[in-house]
């Protein structure tokens, strides 16, 4: 992405050109890298709890893919979003919230997409200023759910604090009331 923006800025690319094909090849490589990382994390987690498992869903987010909307073919860039054309999708909560397993209901209203999580309340650059007078890094290293956060980066622990995110329950209820999902778990 850095090489692309250095050369083209934030301008779009014309489909089927060398530049577009180069971008998509690098994009697909990044998606594959992310998939392998997810599988490695899952494998390591299962090893730690001495169990085995089967992948039931593996969905990318933050991607570009061809899409037809309103009878028009084009490209859809999902930033902070995940495709809705899968059987089941995980909508992650923040470090302080539960995550949800949902069945998407495809809709052009949502651009065939669902949010990838609750979304931020504040920009990353604002988090430490808003939270450091209320919480120490040590206090943020434990969540309301009892999780332990291991993070040596004191800026990042504020950026990713549960307080920096919207409530996942509100986001899930909004999608459910709009008919975009069925909650599974």
Describe the residue ranges of each PLM region.
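Domain-length cofactor-binding catalytic modules of enzymes
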Residues: 1-185
């Amino acid at each position: 992405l850095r090489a692309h923006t250095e050369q083209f800025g934030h301008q779009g690319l014309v489909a089927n050109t060398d530049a577009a094909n180069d971008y998509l090849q690098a994009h697909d490589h990044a998606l594959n890298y992310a998939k392998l990382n997810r599988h490695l994390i899952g494998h390591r987690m299962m090893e730690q709890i001495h169990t085995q498992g089967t992948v039931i869903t593996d969905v990318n987010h933050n991607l570009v893919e061809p899409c037809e909307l309103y009878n028009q073919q084009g490209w859809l860039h999902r930033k902070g979003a995940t495709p809705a054309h899968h059987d089941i999708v995980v909508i992650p909560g923040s470090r302080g919230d539960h995550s949800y397993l949902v069945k998407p209901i495809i809709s052009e209203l949502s651009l065939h997409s669902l949010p990838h999580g609750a979304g931020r309340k504040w920009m990353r650059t604002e988090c430490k200023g808003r939270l450091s007078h209320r919480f120490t890094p040590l206090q943020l290293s434990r969540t309301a759910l009892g999780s332990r956060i291991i993070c040596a980066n004191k800026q990042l622990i504020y950026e990713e604090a549960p307080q920096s995110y919207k409530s996942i329950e509100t986001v899930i209820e909004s999608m459910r009331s709009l008919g975009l999902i069925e909650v599974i778990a």
